[in-house]
Amino acid sequence: LYTDGSSRGNPGPGGYGVILEDIKSGVIRECSEGYKLTTNNRMELMAVIAGLEKLNISPVDVEIITDSRYVCDAVEKKWLFKWESKGFKNKKNKDLWKRFLIHFNKHKIITTWVKVHNNHRQNERCDFLALSASKKTNKKTDHEYEKNIQTKMGFKD
């Protein structure tokens, strides 16, 4: 599972790109999505979640290959599980981390970090998909992110 997320501005319009590659069958699928206002870390994490949600079988061994230290370190350094044990108190993107954990607990997942813009073919393709999605005119709304912005500005429901 190759992933990348980006935002043009942080926050700003963003997108993610995903390549799913089934090693056994050789089948390759791509997906991407754009959002009106979001952050780079939300898009990095959303890319992983979108890829995991596309898996048709469960449980399965999954290698997530990403240029996101945010995602890799949270898993490999076990920060995510510490955050979970504390109820994600004061953690950014807790809505997405909770969604990620649902899939993490279903599958056997490892993460592999790749250096950004280092001629890694699949990472470059995911970057292209993410950037292209961020430029589409029919982008989605990242409701949770926008709700959090309004709450911080004092516009609570």
Which residues are covered by each model-predicted region?
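RNase H catalytic domain
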Residues: 6-13, 49-125, 129, 152-156
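RNase H-like nuclease fold core
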Residues: 1-43, 53-60, 136-146, 153-157
